[in-house]
Amino acid sequence: SFYGCELWNLWDSAVEVFCKAWRQGQRAVWNLPYNTHCRYLSLLCNGIPIHDEICRRFLSFVHKSALRECHPVQFIVKYGLLYGRMFSQCGRNVLYCADRYGFNLNDIFNRHFSANIVTQKCQELGNVEDVAAVNMLFELICTRDDVFTLDGFSKCDINSIIDNICSA
């Protein structure tokens, strides 16, 4: 779906354009209103926001590359991170992620480093109210799509409730 994203420049505005298109696609797949909160989409899909997923994949790629047995690959990554920094796309992206997720640049070279730091940070930022709203939203979507049944409510009523939750 986003093959090669590990090599993207995370500072580029095109990444945000891609993420916006991805969220629009999620809204279309779930048949949700255009003004559905972005924070609900990743919870509804049981994942993390698309931008964070791209960062997670990048960090995993760089971490594995930095610890590779292949010395030319290891050298290029270490040079980009330790000396190139902002002049290197790899260095720029790691600094961006380090600032965003609160880790030290040198942590990448630690064998125990995990790109799941991104997932953990996203889960920390989540709140109980959003989870409850998304659980209700999921049940309403299933009811609207005739997976569940709910007596006493018309499709129009269910769609109104979905619209209200999505934009509240």
Where do the language-model regions lie?
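Conserved, non-catalytic sequence blocks in retroelement Pol enzymes and Pol-derived host proteins
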Residues: 8-18
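Core structural elements
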Residues: 1-2
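Extended C-terminal regions of large enzymes
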Residues: 21-22, 31-167
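General structural signal for alpha-helix termini and helix-helix connectors
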Residues: 5-9, 31
